[in-house]
A protein has these predicted regions:
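Sequence/fold signature of self-assembling virion shell proteins
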Residues: 2-31, 36-55, 75-79, 86, ...
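Alpha-helical scaffold segments that mediate packing/assembly in large oligomeric complexes
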Residues: 91-158, 271-274
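Extended, solvent-exposed, turn-rich assembly/linker loops in the middle of proteins
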Residues: 129-197, 319
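Short coil/turn motif common to extracellular beta-sandwich-like domains
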Residues: 284-295, 299
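Short proline/glycine-enriched turn/loop motifs at strand-loop junctions of beta-rich domains
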Residues: 297-304, 311
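Surface-exposed, short loops/turns at beta-strand junctions within beta-sandwich domains
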Residues: 329-342
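Extracellular recognition modules
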Residues: 342-348
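Extracellular fibronectin type III
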Residues: 352-365
Length: 368
């Protein structure tokens, strides 16, 4: 029986994870790589970072060649997202629950989990991206804006190997479709269509992304420079609840999933806002373990609020009461943080969100 349960757990877990990966808009291989997936019980993964390439020198047949030394640094990806599935199935014990009922609950779990992973992944991208603010995007200027991003990425030696992507809001996709330079996916092959790519422009594969983050228009990037670790800490299984003391003749579909995201190079990820976003800097606070955020541009008035590691992002014109963040005074409010935390800061005018910023806390931003 134990072997059967273990086999079912492995099968269910693989089914859900496969469905999750199929549902992700910010997909593995398209937006994120999975190069550092490993032990799901670890709280963090140390990732080597090298911005320089291996030195190539002339070889001396008599004396050989001197050994060169690379400059490898390390960055930390926190495995800080811990989500659980615990769905009650009434009137069935674990041994008698129908397969189609389990399949329905697994399908629902995969959908909900994929949405949350997409949300958390996008927040990490925005907090680690290089920001480009544009007053207005139109059918007349959108191509030149994308070409400028392409130029900046090429100057930063981001590979132009067919993997550069654009995540585009629906209203911006409508502008792209009017561009004569836009190549529709039907001309790019079946594999491109299957990946959800609408088309290609200036070397970027464009995928529509229905996101409501205030003023966000699109994200450009390359999967080599953003990574995701995505693992089951406890595999999906059907748990009998007869011994719980509360449930009789019932079971539950349970599982626990841990994951994390990390931007490895800010210049490889570009977030475009129109008409713009807040510009924010961080500095150590006065108290140990704190940071202070100073808004330097992009604001209307001086009313701000923040959230630490938000589970969703602020939409334009969200009311202050609906947002529910903590009040922030620019340059004064001290926020208790740890390295790798993400701070969302919103600018409120007439009681509504008008602009946002996302920023990842570095060790140098925290008072020791």
């Amino acid at each position: 029986m134990a072997t059967t349960n273990h086999t079912s757990q492995e099968r269910y877990s693989k089914l859900v994870l496969a469905k999750v990966r199929a549902l992700l808009v910010l997909a593995d291989g398209f937006v994120f790589n999975n190069d550092y997936e490993g032990d799901p019980t670890a709280d963090a993964v140390r990732i080597p970072v090298r911005d320089d390439e291996v030195t190539v020198s002339d070889y001396d047949r008599a004396n050989g060649i001197s050994v060169s030394h690379g400059s490898t640094t390390y960055t930390t990806m926190l495995i800080d997202k811990d989500k659980a599935v615990n769905e009650l199935i009434d009137k069935f014990d674990a041994a008698s629950v129908p397969d189609n009922l389990v399949a329905d609950r697994l399908d629902s779990a995969a959908y909900s989990l994929a949405r949350q992973i997409d949300t958390d992944g996008a927040t990490t991208l925005l907090a680690g991206a290089t920001v480009k603010n544009v007053e207005q995007l139109t059918a007349q200027n959108i191509y030149s804006v994308i070409v400028d991003i392409r130029t900046d990425m090429s100057k930063a030696n981001i590979p132009d190997d067919g993997k550069r992507y654009l995540l585009v809001m629906p209203e911006i996709m409508a502008l792209l479709l009017q561009c004569p330079e836009f190549i529709r996916s039907t001309a790019l092959g079946d594999a491109t269509v299957e990946n959800g790519v609408v088309g290609k422009i200036a070397g970027f594969k464009a995928k529509e992304w229905n996101d409501s983050t205030a003023n966000l228009s699109m994200i450009a990037g390359h999967p080599k420079f953003a990574t995701r670790a995505n693992e089951w800490a406890v595999g999906v299984h059907v748990q009998d609840l007869s011994g719980s003391g509360n449930y009789i003749g019932a079971c539950a579909v349970q599982g626990r999933h841990v994951y994390g995201h990390k931007v490895l190079r800010s210049i490889a990820i570009r977030a475009v806002y129109a008409p713009g976003s807040l510009t924010v800097t961080l500095a150590p606070g006065a108290a140990s373990g704190t940071t202070k955020a100073t808004v330097t541009a992009g604001n209307t008035g001086t009313t701000y609020a923040y959230k630490l590691n938000p589970s969703s992002r602020a939409a334009f014109d969200t009311t202050s009461s609906a947002y529910g963040g903590t009040s922030l005074t620019s340059g004064t409010t001290e926020i208790a943080v740890r390295e790798g935390d993400i701070i969302e800061i919103v600018n409120l005018s007439s009681g509504k969100v008008k602009a946002v910023a996302y920023i990842t806390v570095k060790a140098s931003d925290i008072k020791a």
